Amino acid sequence: MISKLSRLVVENILKIICEKIIINNILIVNKNNKFSGIIDELYIKAESIIFNKINISNIDIKISDLVLNLAFNNKKSFIKNPYASIKMRLTRDNINKTLSNNKWKSLKTSIESFISMSFQSIEIYNKSIYFISSDGFSNKNIDYILQYDKNSISLVNNINQEKLSIFNDKNISIKNLFFCESHIEIEIGSKIIFN
């Protein structure tokens, strides 16, 4: 009963904080098989996510030491800030939809200034990013990659190695980033903060 209630709370929180989400699986692990408000590990698999106007194809989340204080009798419910390990997949379509959203207009403008071209979309192949110009042509002579360090991701011109920081957050640790044939996979770690 408590496990079902915890699962329902997690599902509802995900549906509240995401503009869109298809939840494939939620697994709650408690070492002593009892629920006392603490979840040792929470695993979430989801797809077709839109979070903060960012489109994500697939996501695997592992949350450790989650404390749920469920309130009854009109007392306030809250969740203490747990640590999350997140693996996400971004397809070409995800990135194009994200960059076409008004929320990310300044990022797109920065990229256009960096690559000296207006673009309508991107392509991912050969472990690189290619920009499709507004007139529909791709400059196959110039490709870009993504590089990461502890808290940031940069777009890098493969010819002259110039960089543009496209993500920087001291609260998020970038663990891994790699290109597959048609998508990008990113692994991050962060404390989850609920406001």
Each model region followed by its residue ranges:
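N-terminal beta-strand/beta-hairpin edge segment
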Residues: 14-93, 191-192
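Hydrophobic, proline/glycine-rich low-complexity stretches
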Residues: 1-19
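Short N-terminal helix-initiation segments at or just after the protein's N-terminus
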Residues: 5-7, 26-31, 124, 128
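Mature, soluble, non-transmembrane domains
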Residues: 88-182, 189-194
